[in-house]
């Protein structure tokens, strides 16, 4: 084996070619890094592309690059390490350890056999880290062991910026059960140290944004948010990521711009325009709808929601159904357009998670109350479930409980039981405020403090309404309905 040492070179990696390494007239830019790995110089260049794509969460493209590296140099051991990691999407809660283990098996059937293929102590340490990640134990246990291994690599090789970046990502990953600010700030601090050395490192920019994408810490992420899309414009996810910070700060115009670019880029990259949208396009479109609604651009939001409706009618899979449910709920709550034809589109819940069923049944319950259908509202309330108290730090896990209380409160109000209604909504608002804020569009789709504030407004209790609109805005900065309500309460 030949060793290609690039320790003195910061590669501004601009490649000619598609993710499959075929020639193409379009230059692709994914950022810059410097990573020493054993193998031929030609294969090393393609490996670096895969590494940068991996930091950008362009997993399919990264896998193609790592496979192309192996084709150029079958002994390029780190290319197998990279390929194995393309099946692990930690922040998306998507895991395929069997696929990763199959990649490792290409190197050998045992950890000892595989280690023999990695020529340096440092490269062996990288292998050992994923042996922990894809070894025995449940997902959380393996993630903790993996993070510890990356921490050891980072400590042993402090000049290895990619080790630092992957360690930062692992700290975000092990925040199980909800956002742990201590872990997130540790990750952010590591990312900042990388950016001081290499301000064009895509992993540092990317993981910095994830570390800070809550309303409290978002100002710390503005540098990365503004720069990331410039550094890695060929990565669809990089085009989107800045909006994590913009949403947390209520910067809706920038959020609209970034998600428009990301959505259009994702669709343009589809080999067949008639194929269903991929995850990147779906994600950007959902966020775009929310950003448009926060600017009062409900007609434009409806046009984008119609794209999800079209996907639902043409394909109807789990992905299409859950995307339509979430986007429809967001649109109806934010626009208050309860007479919209979107409200009547049927969706099959088979195979969908409790989160999406609860979200849609909440909407069905509100629609029933809008038409004075008490029995319909009761049916929806039962379908939401969430009747029992829950202890969790995760907003998403808490959603059924929050929406159960919110709908029950509205049902009590409709029945004239004002005291009961307020008690239920206050319980929901207090419960929601007890957990860290979520990034992106509002979770739950109806912020419960906003609902409580709306109720106080309807009762003429303007000071209590003001207090609760302000509470809602703490976790949903710049949210239009809360801002409008707050202005009304003040006057």
Regions found by a protein language model. Name each.
Residues 40-49, 75-87, 115-137, 159-176, ...:
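Amphipathic alpha-helical repeat scaffolds of TPR domains
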Residues 57-60, 136-239:
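A conserved hydrophobic secondary-structure block that centers on an alpha-helix together
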Residues 58-64, 83-120, 128-141, 174-182, ...:
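Inter-helical turn/loop elements of alpha-helical hairpins
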Residues 64-97, 156-165, 201, 317-318, ...:
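Short, charge-rich amphipathic alpha-helical segments embedded
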Residues 70-72, 154-156, 195-197, 226-234, ...:
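Solenoid-like repeat scaffolds
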């Amino acid at each position: 084996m030949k060793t290609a040492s690039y320790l003195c070179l910061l590669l501004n990696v601009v490649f000619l070619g598609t993710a499959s390494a075929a020639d193409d007239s379009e230059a692709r830019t994914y950022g810059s890094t410097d990573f020493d790995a054993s193998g031929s110089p030609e294969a090393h260049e393609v490996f670096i592309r895969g590494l940068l794509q991996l930091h950008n969460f362009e997993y399919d493209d990264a896998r193609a690059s790592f496979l192309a590296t192996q084709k150029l140099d079958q002994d390029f051991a780190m290319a197998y390490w990279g390929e194995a990691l393309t099946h692990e999407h930690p922040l998306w809660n998507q895991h395929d350890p069997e696929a990763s283990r199959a990649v490792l098996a290409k190197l050998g059937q045992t950890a000892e056999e595989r280690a023999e293929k990695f020529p340096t102590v440092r490269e062996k340490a990288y292998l050992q880290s994923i042996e922990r990640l894809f070894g025995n134990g449940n997902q959380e246990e393996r993630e903790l062991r993996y993070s510890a291994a990356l921490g050891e690599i980072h400590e042993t090789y402090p000049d290895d910026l990619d080790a630092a970046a992957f360690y930062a990502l692992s700290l975000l990953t092990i925040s199980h059960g909800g956002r742990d600010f201590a872990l997130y700030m540790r990750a952010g601090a590591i990312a900042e140290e990388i950016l001081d050395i290499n301000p064009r490192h895509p992993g540092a920019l990317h993981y910095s944004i994830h570390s800070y994408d809550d309303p409290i810490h978002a100002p710390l992420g503005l540098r990365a948010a503004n720069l990331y899309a410039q550094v890695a414009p060929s990565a669809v996810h990089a085009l989107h990521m800045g909006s994590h910070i913009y949403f947390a700060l209520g910067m809706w115009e920038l959020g609209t711009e970034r998600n428009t670019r990301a959505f259009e880029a994702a669709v343009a990259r589809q080999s067949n325009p008639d194929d269903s949208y991929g995850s990147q396009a779906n994600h950007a479109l959902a966020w775009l709808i929310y950003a448009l609604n926060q600017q009062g651009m409900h007609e434009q939001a409806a046009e984008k929601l119609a794209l999800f409706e079209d996907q639902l009618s043409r394909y109807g899979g789990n992905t299409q159904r859950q995307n339509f449910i979430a986007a429809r709920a967001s649109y109806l709550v934010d626009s208050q357009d309860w007479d919209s034809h979107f409200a009547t589109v049927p969706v099959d819940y088979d195979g969908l998670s409790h989160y999406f069923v609860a979200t849609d049944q909440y909407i069905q319950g509100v629609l029933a109350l809008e038409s004075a259908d008490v029995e319909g509202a009761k049916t929806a309330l039962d379908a939401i479930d969430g009747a029992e108290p829950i202890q969790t730090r995760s907003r998403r896990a808490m959603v059924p409980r929050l929406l159960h209380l919110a709908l029950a409160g509205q049902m009590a109000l409709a029945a004239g039981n004002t005291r009961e209604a307020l008690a239920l909504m206050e319980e929901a608002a207090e419960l929601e405020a007890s957990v860290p804020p979520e990034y992106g569009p509002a979770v739950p789709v109806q912020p419960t403090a906003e609902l409580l504030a709306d109720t106080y407004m309807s009762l003429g209790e303007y000071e209590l309404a003001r207090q609760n609109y302000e509470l809602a805005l703490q976790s949903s900065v710049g949210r239009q309905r809360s801002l409008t309500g707050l202005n009304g309460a003040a006057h």
